[in-house]
Amino acid sequence: MAFVVSSAFAQGKGEVPDSLFDKAVEFIKRAEGWHRGQMPYIGYGHCLLPGETLTENLSKAQADSLLRSDLRKCCDAFREFENDALLLGVLSYNVGIFRLKGHGRMPKSRLIRKLEKGERDINEEYVSFRCYKGKVIPSIERRRKAEFALFYIP
């Protein structure tokens, strides 16, 4: 599958083109599904934060707006990785920014360490985020492989 990449993105400025961002939003919608009655998750996987007064009675438009806002924050957190900002943003939307970047006693992930060294062979590290409670979950593994195929720019 080939993508036409905007010139700012191709030049490595870390800007995610709208067409690719929209594709990521649609992918997450399909993968997450609609969360109703599964608090603290609402809409398309938004985790309620302390102080947020949202309820699970969101409209699809509100949930879409919330997803876009959350994904934009995730992509912005990885802006220094330029072409990989969207790929890392999509992953961090699901696993959390600090699981990748590290924080306090939590070390940086192998994926981030490899990218910081300039290594581009990251498929194995990306797909390694496929476990839940220490067990490999086949559906999560399929999702990671699909994300990598769609959003990795060599």
Which role does the model predict for each range below?
Residues M1-V4:
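Bacterial N-terminal signal peptides
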Residues S6-Q38, H46-T53, L58-A77, I97-P154:
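Long, amphipathic alpha-helical surface segments
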